Amino acid sequence: MTELITLAAATPMFEVTDKVLVFSAAFCAIALAAVGSAWGTGAAASSAIGAWKKCYAQNKPAPFQLMIFAGCPLSQTIYGMILMFSIMGAELTKPGIWIFYMITGVLSGIAIGISALWQGRACAAACDAFSETGKGFANQMVVICIIETVAIFVMAFSMVLLSSFAK
């Protein structure tokens, strides 16, 4: 914040406005990714809790692996954070360039967030299946990681786009 105040005193208005809008774009990247992570972890955690309840009711041991499933969608927040830092490092070479960063931040954040949401749904199904059978953990993780790959691709391609645009 102090950086923006100092910047405002020494630069023309459009540069300050552009910088504020780029920082807003950066926040969109992490915020939208985090919304998806929250939704996904909520779905997976709810399923894990229900599966543990079934295990306790049947006097079966509660599998720890369900905690792994419940936490999987959190990684998309990290991808949003990495993208946020990439956008914050933007060089504002021309007035109005902020729109490029805003579109990248918003669309990337949405895509990463949707990946987390669907990963959470898959993790919820994995919790149910694994708690009942005690089998298939590796296969379930592979399928869950396929969904994760979408978020990694979005982050990587967005960063390539950001770096090529800055040239």
Model-derived regions: residue spans:
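Hydrophobic, small-residue-rich transmembrane alpha-helices and their short perimembrane loops
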Residues: 2-167
